[in-house]
Amino acid sequence: MAKCFVTGKKKSFGNTRSHAMNANRRTWKANLQKVRILVDGKPKRVWVSARALKSGKIKRV
């Protein structure tokens, strides 16, 4: 799984719990989008989280 270029977000781990409270391991994937941004003055395609895009931390090219 990819990692956010800006925030470093990646998938997180935890348990799903059944009605009987049995634990099963699962993952939650971050909402990552592949976008083109300027890195050192050159356009580059990177994975960026939706939160970083919405908050304006990154500017698309």
UniProtKB/Swiss-Prot annotation:
Cite the Pfam families for this sequence.
Ribosomal_L28
What does the UniProt keyword field contain?
A: Ribonucleoprotein, Ribosomal protein
Q: Which InterPro entries match?
A: Bacterial_rp_bL28, Ribosomal_bL28, Ribosomal_bL28/bL31-like_sf, Ribosomal_bL28_bact-type, Ribosomal_bL28_sf
A GO CC term assigned to this protein in UniProt = ribosome
Which Gene3D superfamilies does the entry link to? Ribosomal protein L28/L24
Q: Which GO terms describe its biological process?
A: translation
GO molecular function annotation: structural constituent of ribosome
| Entry similarity comment | Belongs to the bacterial ribosomal protein bL28 family.
- Which PANTHER family does this one have? 50S RIBOSOMAL PROTEIN L28, LARGE RIBOSOMAL SUBUNIT PROTEIN BL28A
Per its record, how is this protein called by name?
Large ribosomal subunit protein bL28
Task: Write down the species.
Answer: Geobacillus thermodenitrificans (strain NG80-2)
